[in-house]
Amino acid sequence: MLQIKIVAVGKIRERFLMEGIKEYAKRLSAYIRLEMTEIADEPCPERLSAADEERVKDREGERLLKGIGPQEHVILLDLQGKEFTSPDFSEYMDELALMGKSSVTFIIGGSLGVSGEVRKRADYRWSFSRLTFPHPLMRLMLLEQIYRAMRISKGEPYHK
């Protein structure tokens, strides 16, 4: 069974998001083993110098990379990444399985983005859209897309 890990900066505080995440995690349990890890975000005042922003990203980046093994296929959610359609994402996940990639880790960075080290570690950079979304909402959206991809892959009715 495919192992999917989601590593994200920050804590989800909104109950409606937690409930949605819990629901999709339950749905996904028939298809994958899911692990979700929250990484503490660095204190970040409104106005930071460029050097301070880099320090924040570096510290968060160290924590993001800490639990990622060398064999894991890493997908970074990134505004500058490539976009998928839902069927294309499903096909990509199927291709990973065919290549023997049994462990896939998705990274959702903090409000300032991610460090250069995190970008280097990423095997793929995926953009959901050119729009900016709240990071906690991205976790729910990611789980929904993973669920949709699993259903498409199995030929089950869901994708419309």
UniProtKB/Swiss-Prot annotation:
Family statement: Belongs to the RNA methyltransferase RlmH family.
Molecular function (Gene Ontology), one example: rRNA (pseudouridine-N3-)-methyltransferase activity
Reaction(s) catalysed (UniProt annotation): pseudouridine(1915) in 23S rRNA + S-adenosyl-L-methionine = N(3)-methylpseudouridine(1915) in 23S rRNA + S-adenosyl-L-homocysteine + H(+)
Localization (cell): Cytoplasm
InterPro entries: Alpha/beta_knot_MTases (IPR029028), RlmH-like (IPR003742), tRNA_m1G_MTases_N (IPR029026)
Coiled coil: none
Annotated source species: Desulfitobacterium hafniense (strain DSM 10664 / DCB-2)
GTP-binding recorded as keyword: no
This protein's GO CC annotations: cytoplasm
Name the UniProt record assigns to this protein: Ribosomal RNA large subunit methyltransferase H
Swiss-Prot/TrEMBL keywords: Cytoplasm, Methyltransferase, rRNA processing, S-adenosyl-L-methionine, Transferase
Biological function: Specifically methylates the pseudouridine at position 1915 (m3Psi1915) in 23S rRNA.
Binding residues for S-adenosyl-L-methionine: 77, 109, 128-133
Tagged with keyword Methyltransferase: yes
EC number: 2.1.1.177
Subunit structure: Homodimer.
